[in-house]
From Swiss-Prot:
Residues annotated as domain tr-type G: 9-275
Family: Belongs to the TRAFAC class translation factor GTPase superfamily. Classic translation factor GTPase family. PrfC subfamily.
Name this polypeptide is given: Peptide chain release factor 3
Assigned GO CC terms: cytosol
Residues that bind GTP: 18-25, 86-90, 140-143
GO terms of molecular function: GTP binding; GTPase activity; translation release factor activity, codon nonspecific; translation release factor activity, codon specific
Biological function: Increases the formation of ribosomal termination complexes and stimulates activities of RF-1 and RF-2. It binds guanine nucleotides and has strong preference for UGA stop codons. It may interact directly with the ribosome. The stimulation of RF-1 and RF-2 is significantly reduced by GTP and GDP, but not by GMP.
Length: 524
């Protein structure tokens, strides 16, 4: 195998998905710690302390203890290169998470052992399903009084429609939690919340007398449980996992470091290396020597001192080298990239080289757009995930009219990076924001104030849902003339129908049967 191919095969690019408060940020920190990327795992709960979670760098995140933005963290582990894409953990930030999930080859799903499968988990898993993304599952918080493990597996299977293959099995829970049994190598890891890595001792074999010495009567309970689990659960099938049909399940307690290393080992051993990617014209293989990639996130003003914008680009093929010239397919322009960066949350490092599966940051001043494809010359267009119709709408009202230009620039930039969607009705001067969740409006207001110097208020706007319009020029002109107050342009100058209620939407659809009213639109 060539050195280039071996570099590609070493890559593991994944994201963590979960419902808020299931422990995603804690798990992210502990994975970084086990991987040697950080010396001390930040205590996520200590919101008032000076130290905050490494992956939560925005001021609003520090105040609220949530992961609002997506960041990228790269670290070596067991002769592999891990690319961990942190995703917004709050349920109001799902669309940004959707886009991040287009850039990964696999995902880790975190389930709270107390609450089981929750709403946001279902939404995010459905996005992963669109690409049959392989999923590893980590059932967290076993140090608390939890639901029965078999009940949790049943719920995952019935609610998410995915086979579970337990890889480890817990010994007790809450105050009686003693560790886990590894079903595939017949070892037991004992839990100690005071041990540095959460593990007090590891022994071999269920029949080992040391097991009885350490946990007494729980040893016989474990032997019975394991016999039942082996008989009743699915055996691990790697191909089913890679096809997105089965999820290997691990149990642990991220806050206590327990079970995290087994999960990280599974990412290396089970998760796929960079996968082929679809474009509008052909499939791109990760081992092709020519560079290609797509932008899945734009982040403005990551560092207020720099006042810059960073385009996060997933490399799909080839090798990136500092100073190389790459083509922005949408414009035909060539960029000479001398200052591509990689991230450890807010820490920036200039990158000399990167390979398929890696994420690089390209500094720019608004010339790079969400979904842009870059190549060494070939006219490719990577296709991916749609933008989703917002569920909430607000009208922006500026408090100082002299700042209108700054408001327009700020809203445009924030919409381009995915913080919200921006709509401009044809027959008014209103600036309408659309979001998947209400907290996004708080984030936009906060960033407008602190990054653009604009004090803005958001008013309720009479809109129940939005639909992108697709049809002939004549039909689009006709609906715009008839429903001018409801038809708007989005940030890409595409027609959107803003329906005040479902009845109004239905009437418009019946009146214009040749126009498609779309809940999603392809942005890649």
């Amino acid at each position: 195998m060539s050195s280039f191919s071996s570099e590609v095969q070493r890559r593991r690019t994944f994201a963590i998905i979960s419902h808020p408060d299931a422990g995603k940020t804690t798990l992210t920190e502990k994975l970084l710690w086990f991987g040697g990327a950080i010396q001390v795992a930040g205590e996520v709960r200590g919101r008032k302390a000076a130290r905050h979670a490494t992956s939560d760098w925005m001021e609003l995140e520090k105040q609220r203890g949530i992961s609002v933005t997506s960041s990228v963290m790269q670290f070596p582990y067991r002769e592999h290169m891990i690319n961990l894409l942190d995703t917004p953990g709050h349920d109001d930030f799902s669309e940004d998470t959707y886009r991040t999930l287009t850039a990964v080859d696999s995902a880790v799903m975190v389930i709270d052992s107390v609450n089981g499968v929750e709403a946001q988990t279902i939404k995010l898993l459905n996005v992963c399903r669109m690409r049959d993304t392989p999923i590893l599952t980590f059932i967290n918080k076993l140090d608390r009084e939890s639901r029965a493990p078999i009940e949790l597996l049943d719920e995952i299977e019935s609610t998410l429609g995915m086979q579970c293959a337990p890889m480890t099995w817990p010994i007790g829970m809450g105050k009686s939690f003693r560790g886990v049994y590894h079903l595939y190598n017949d070892t037991i890891s004992f839990f100690d919340p005071h041990a540095e890595k959460g593990t007090a001792e590891i022994i071999q074999g269920l029949d080992n007398p040391r097991l009885d010495e350490l946990i007494g009567a729980q040893a016989d309970d474990l032997r019975v449980d394991v016999e039942l689990v082996r008989g009743a659960s699915n055996a691990f099938d790697k191909q089913a996992y890679l096809d997105g049909k089965q999820t290997p399940v691990f149990f642990g307690s991220a806050i206590n470091n327990f079970g995290v290393q087994s999960l990280l080992d599974a990412v290396v051993e089970l998760s796929p290396p960079p996968l082929p990617r679809n474009t509008a014209s052909r499939v791109v293989e990760p081992t092709e020597e020519k560079f290609s990639g797509f932008v899945f996130k734009i982040q403005a003003n990551m560092d207020p001192k720099h006042r810059d914008r960073i385009a996060f680009l997933r490399i799909c093929s080839g090798r990136f080298e500092r100073g190389m010239k790459i083509k922005q397919v949408a414009t035909g322009k060539t960029l000479s990239v001398n200052n591509a960066i990689t991230f450890m949350a807010q820490d920036r490092t200039t990158m000399d080289e990167a390979y398929s599966g890696d994420i690089i940051g390209i500094p720019n001043h608004g010339t790079v757009k969400l979904g842009d494809t870059f190549t060494e010359g070939e006219n490719l267009k990577f296709i991916g995930i749609p933008s989703f119709a917002p569920e909430y709408f607000r009208r922006a009202r500026i408090k100082n009219p002299m700042k209108m230009k700054q408001l327009q620039i700020g809203l445009k930039q924030l919409a381009e990076e995915g913080a919200s969607q921006l709509f401009r009705p044809l027959l008014s001067n209103d600036l309408i924001l659309g979001a998947i969740g209400l907290l996004q409006f708080d984030v936009v207001a906060h960033r407008l104030e602190h990054e653009y110097g604009v004090d803005v208020a958001f008013e309720n706007y009479d809109c129940a849902t939005a639909r992108w319009l697709r049809g002939s020029d004549a039909d689009l002109k006709a609906i715009a003339d008839k429903y001018g107050f409801n038809v708007a342009l989005d940030g890409n100058e595409e027609y959107v129908y803003l329906a005040p209620n479902r009845v109004n939407l239905q009437m418009a659809q019946e009146r214009y049967p040749d126009i498609e009213f779309l809940e999603t639109r392809e942005i890649f």
